C-alpha cells in the first residue's frame, strides 16, 4: 500500500517565510503560480531607500525570488484561470469583502482552482468566502 502524495499550490507568503515553516506542513509536491513570481519580483523593486537595512531587505527578497525561479516551473495565469477569477471575485463580494483590494491573492486562488490543487497559505483569512471553490490549507506562521 502506497502513501498518497500530497500536492499543492503555495501562496506567496509561504515562499517568503519558507525557511521557518515546518516541512511537514507543506505538500510533498509543491507548485507556484506565475502570479507568485510577479509578486516576488515586485517585492524586490518596492523596497524604499538605499541605506544598509534597505539594501539587506532588497537582497533578501531577491534571494527568495531567485530560489523560486530555480526551484519551480510556475503554473501560468491562463484564460481558464481568468474565467475562474471572475467567479472568485463574485464569491468574495458575496461574502461582504472587496475583491479589488486583493487581486493577486484572488488570481493565485484562481490558478489553484483551475489546477485542482489545494492552496497552502499562512493567511487563510485572505481566502475567506472561497470554500466552495478552492481548498485552503492553513500553515502556521514561523515564530519571528
Regions from the language model: what does each represent?
Residues 113:
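Anion (oxyanion) recognition and catalysis
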Residues 2-8, 18-110, 128-144:
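PIN-domain endoribonuclease scaffold, especially VapC-family toxins
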Amino acid at each position: 500500500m502506497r502513501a498518497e502524495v500530497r500536492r499543492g499550490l503555495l501562496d506567496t507568503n509561504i515562499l517568503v517565510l519558507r525557511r521557518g515553516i515546518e516541512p511537514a506542513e507543506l505538500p510533498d509536491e509543491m507548485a507556484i503560480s506565475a502570479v507568485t513570481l510577479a509578486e516576488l519580483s515586485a517585492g524586490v523593486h518596492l523596497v524604499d531607500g538605499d541605506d544598509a537595512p534597505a539594501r539587506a531587505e532588497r537582497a533578501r527578497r531577491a534571494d527568495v525570488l531567485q530560489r523560486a525561479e530555480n526551484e519551480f516551473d510556475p503554473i501560468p495565469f491562463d484564460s481558464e484561470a481568468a474565467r475562474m477569477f471572475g467567479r472568485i471575485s463574485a464569491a468574495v463580494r458575496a461574502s461582504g469583502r472587496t475583491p479589488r483590494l486583493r487581486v493577486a491573492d484572488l488570481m493565485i486562488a484562481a490558478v489553484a482552482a483551475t489546477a485542482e490543487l489545494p492552496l497552502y497559505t499562512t493567511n487563510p483569512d485572505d481566502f475567506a468566502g472561497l470554500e466552495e471553490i478552492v481548498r485552503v490549507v492553513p500553515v502556521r506562521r514561523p515564530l519571528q
